Amino acid sequence: MSAVPVSDVHAYLTGLQDNIVQALEQAGGESFRTDTWQRPEGGGGVSRLIEGGQLLERAGVLFSHVHGTRLPPSASAHRPELAGRSWQAMGVSLVLHPRNPYVPTTHMNVRMFVAAARPGHDENDVFWFGGGLDLTPYYAFEDDARHFHQVCRAALDPHGAAYYPQYKRWCDEYFYLKHRQEMRGVGGVFFDDLNEPGFDASFALLRSVGDAFLPAYLPIVQRRRDTPYTQAQRDFQAYRRGRYVEFNLVFDRGTLFGLQSGGRTESILLSMPPMAQWRYDWQPAAGSPEAALAGFLQPRDWA
């Protein structure tokens, strides 16, 4: 029988949260607030957040590690052989909503799930990893999108040439608003149910994705953060943030599962922007920078 080294993953994830928060605090000159919470049914987490900042208008970098004694049938519907096992789930997730409309919003998540072997049974722990990172710009800059995707490709290529194209396509398909017929942003990479290469190789790939976040995103922040903007550009940012809200509340599996299963609402909704706006049948002026964004919201080869 084989046991998954949960403590190694826990140590990596808490270190990743610390590293990202420290880098963002250094970049923005503002401190994250810490909210430590416990889950009555088992486990808890640490939420690090900023609201009303100058660089980051709203941001959350969250770590959670929750566990239970019996995997509920709803969670094992596609793996009925796991029903009744004890389980653990842990991960780091973040969403950053900058104030300047020229700085893109971004999202990153890395996570692991383990269903433990039952005592007295000839079986192994069952694990899988998932995660990804993606970019949601409000104004279209090709060099930003290419940089983000090039870092994603460089993170995955050492693990196999097939990973980046596969995970990039998965991201394009997942972060898609069917009713708007557009992607949420310019994508990135997204994966789930990763365990086939074995624990060590799967965990190494997860670390590569988590470690890619800062080099993928911070150079874009530094490039755009001092770009002057007007209230009209802030209004367009709020309008596009409305699409972010639509995706999260209508399509995002993690948000829907969390809200429907009695998850921690404050953590789940920390992904929401501080302000969003809807306008009836509004269209940007032809040839405007706002209109140019539409060309970024369909799948493209960036790297």
UniProtKB/Swiss-Prot annotation:
Its cofactor is a divalent metal cation. Homodimer. Pathway: Porphyrin-containing compound metabolism; protoporphyrin-IX biosynthesis; protoporphyrinogen-IX from coproporphyrinogen-III (O2 route): step 1/1. One of its GO terms (biological process) is protoporphyrinogen IX biosynthetic process. Belongs to the aerobic coproporphyrinogen-III oxidase family. Substrate binds at residues 93, 109-111, 262-264. The keyword Transmembrane does not apply. Involved in the heme biosynthesis. Catalyzes the aerobic oxidative decarboxylation of propionate groups of rings A and B of coproporphyrinogen-III to yield the vinyl groups in protoporphyrinogen-IX. The keyword Transmembrane helix does not apply. The record marks 179 as: Important for dimerization. Residues 244-279 are annotated as: Important for dimerization. A divalent metal cation binds at residues 97, 107, 149, 179. This is Oxygen-dependent coproporphyrinogen-III oxidase. Its EC number is 1.3.3.3. It is found in: Cytoplasm. It is an enzyme of class 1 (oxidoreductase). The active site is at residue 107. One of its GO terms (molecular function) is protein homodimerization activity. NCBIfam families: PRK05330.1. Keywords: Cytoplasm, Heme biosynthesis, Metal-binding, Oxidoreductase, Porphyrin biosynthesis. One of its GO terms (cellular component) is cytoplasm. Gene3D superfamilies: Coproporphyrinogen III oxidase, aerobic. InterPro entries: Coprogen_oxidase_aer (IPR001260), Coprogen_oxidase_aer_sf (IPR036406), Coprogen_oxidase_CS (IPR018375). It holds the Pfam family Coprogen_oxidas. The lineage of its organism: Bacteria, Pseudomonadati, Pseudomonadota, Betaproteobacteria, Burkholderiales.
